Amino acid sequence: ECDNKKLPRQFSSASYYTGPLIDAHLHMPFTFDVPKALYAQADYDGAVLEKDVAAGSIMCVFDKTGVQSAIGFYVIPSLLKGQAVVQIKQIEEKFPGRITPFIMPAHVSALNIQPADVESVLKANPGLFKGFGEIGLYKDAYKGTSPDDVSLLPFYEIANKYGLVVMMHPDYGQEKAIEKIVKEYPDVTFLFHGDQLHPLVLKTDFLGRYPNAYLSVDDIFLDIQNEGQSSSLYGDKSKEEFVSKFKRDY
């Protein structure tokens, strides 16, 4: 049973936003069972929806925290695409509009969905999926793959054809390739994520020059000292000290 009583106000700032929230980066539990040994190649171990995590419990957290909806990245492996989509459709039917489904590659080379697979899923489920990604180019399955690599271009073409958003987490040193694809595909909306792009986004007018380019800002607030790659807002504070000061000052 869901206790969806709203959480009390956490911060001290007089200017306090109380409107709806959208989670722009939600990795959904798997909608299929996969041998753990196989997914060890992806260097992450995912929960299974309705087995380890109930969809209703996700919605309960949304209701408690004022999250209206979320962009949900659903892993769809090439060999299990039919099975994977079944539960995605069920969630959309049961909780319409709460999760905006994106088709996410498996980030395991042998299971990564191919352009023809993506198109077949889109044709079989018209209007269900709104984006493609997250594409994690820093992951081993994509290591050394540039955003403008010939292997990725068909996905951008499909995004253009079906009106999909492309969500990408690039690797370091890929700024020029990022600018190239954004420029060459002006009708495709690109949503980027990751501190790899901070120099380009925060120190240039990249977002101003390209209205089809967006950055999810949540990653700017990530990474507590000794628990991540950077310490942008946290500095040398402990987690507890940061939370206390953040509540006080914001």
Where are the regions a protein language model picked out?
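Extracellular/periplasmic catalytic domains that process cell-envelope and extracellular macromolecules
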Residues: 15-17, 63-66, 93-95, 124-127, ...
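Hydrophobic faces of well-ordered beta-strands that scaffold small-molecule active sites
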Residues: 22-26, 69-72, 99-104, 130-134, ...
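Alpha-helical scaffolding within the catalytic cores
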Residues: 6-10, 51-59, 80-90, 113-121, ...
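Active-site gating loops and adjacent loop-to-helix segments of metal-dependent hydrolytic enzymes
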Residues: 18, 34-48, 129, 214-236
